[in-house]
Amino acid sequence: MSEEVVQDAPLENNELNAEIDLQKTIQEEYKLWKQNVPFLYDLVITHALEWPSLTIQWLPDKKTIPGTDYSIQRLILGTHTSGNDQNYLQIASVQLPNFDEDTTEFTPSTIRRAQATGSYTIEISQKIPHDGDVNRARYMPQKPEIIATMGEGGNAYIFDTTCHDALTTGEALPQAVLKGHTAEGFGLCWNPNLPGNLATGAEDQVICLWDVQTQSFTSSETKVISPIAKYHRHTDIVNDVQFHPQHEALLASVSDDCTLQIHDTRLNPEEEAPKVIQAHSKAINAVAINPFNDYLLATASADKTVALWDLRNPYQRLHTLEGHEDEVYGLEWSPHDEPILASSSTDRRVCIWDLEKIGEEQTPEDAEDGSPELLFMHGGHTNRISEFSWCPNERWVVGSLADDNILQIWSPSRVIWGRDHVQVSPRDLE
């Protein structure tokens, strides 16, 4: 027994020293990042949350405040207390500085104020009790007051925020409980073309399809809803699902089984998916379909890459985006510019890619900084990034969360992205 302890001690010391070295490197990188913020960003707002949040999404509304230099915009957040406290679905109100409408950028005075004083506030404006950690939360596009969540116990929940007070206490009382999964999950997506149509994916390897449009919700009753269809097509954890932005019957899913699958919800769910693509050599964590281009799709993987695909011929990869140093978990196209894609990783970075730059010639010096399509790398977090979200109302504004409770709202400098973007064809990526 004593020999085993002696043998294990050097290994433990090595791991401890490696962790100390890593934390030292992270702090040095953060210090360097902070020094360069005035040159790299038009806006940075940092806010410490009470508890970590695994999920973030901007709501679509924007409230202009007369006589001020800012607007009020809102974020959906959750809590991740790991059983140490009551969990909540949260709405945060964010003061965002006004853009100069003529140049679609922040005015210089507001940039300096935001960077120097942190004068724009972030406040939790609504807290709704939630059963367990909030793994994912998304609003219904047709009715933003309706929010779906994925919980840690396998159930999904529907909340009507108008049925809850600003700071609700007590037990969780969702408007509906969606029972269909036997394990927790993170896959959650509303159908943008079919109100009330919702897809979920979980660790039980199942995709569930739900219809909540026919339900009428009240503040006093929690309804139990069963799925209208279940897909047992993956052979491992389903990590993400996304409906096609233009076609209501098309649903994409990705899994630890390394496949990208395209489903047609009009077909028999007992049959094999119409398209099954072995997209990566390791687990696929996220999928995103371009909102402007019907055929352009991206996947993010544990192999540290993002892959681009053409839905007309998805069995041949268009291009690989390389720049992350660890597993890629987050993926979202810009809602404003067709060729702009962002990704996040356990390497504590959010990368912004410009597909128009694929194939551009580089000097050896530029090549050392990454591929030509790597437009920007946000390095403001010192812990693993949970999720990020593009702001729908302000071009080039992103909100991102890290496991250390830090929420950041940021916008790269116009010097970096300042040019008009044109449409990109999948043929140009080949």
Swiss-Prot record:
Q: Where are the residues marked Important for interaction with HAT1 as a site?
A: L296
Q: One GO cellular component term, please give it.
A: chromosome, centromeric region
Q: Report TM segments.
A: none
Q: Where are the WD repeats?
A: 129-169, 180-220, 233-273, 279-319, 323-363, 380-420
- UniProt keyword Phosphoprotein present: yes
Q: Which UniProt keywords apply?
A: Centromere, Chromatin regulator, Chromosome, Cytoplasm, Kinetochore, Nucleus, Phosphoprotein, Repeat, WD repeat
Which residue ranges does the record annotate as region Interaction with the histone H4 N-terminus?
Answer: 365-369
- For the keyword Cytoplasm, the answer is yes
* Modification Phosphoserine, positions: S425
Location in or out of the cell: Cytoplasm; Nucleus; Chromosome, Centromere; Chromosome, Centromere, Kinetochore
Q: Which domain of life is it from?
A: Eukaryota
Cross-referenced Pfam families: Beta-prop_EIPR1, CAF1C_H4-bd, WD40
| GO MF annotation: an example | H3-H4 histone complex chaperone activity
Q: Which GO terms describe its biological process?
A: CENP-A containing chromatin assembly; chromatin remodeling
Subunit organization:
Component of the HAT-B complex composed of at least hat1 and hat2. The HAT-B complex binds to histone H4 tail. Component of the CENP-A recruiting complex composed of at least mis16, mis19, mis19 and mis20.
The UniProt entry, under PANTHER family, shows: WD40 REPEAT FAMILY
Per the entry, what this protein does is: Regulatory subunit of the histone acetylase B (HAT-B) complex. The complex acetylates 'Lys-12' of histone H4 which is required for telomeric silencing. Component of the CENP-A recruiting complex that ensures the integrity of mitotic spindles through maintenance of kinetochore factors mis6/CENP-I and cnp1/CENP-A. Maintains the deacetylated state of histones specifically in the central core of the centromeres.
Family the entry assigns: Belongs to the WD repeat RBAP46/RBAP48/MSI1 family.
Name by which UniProt lists this protein: Histone acetyltransferase type B subunit 2
Q: In the UniProt record, what gene is named as encoding this protein?
A: mis16
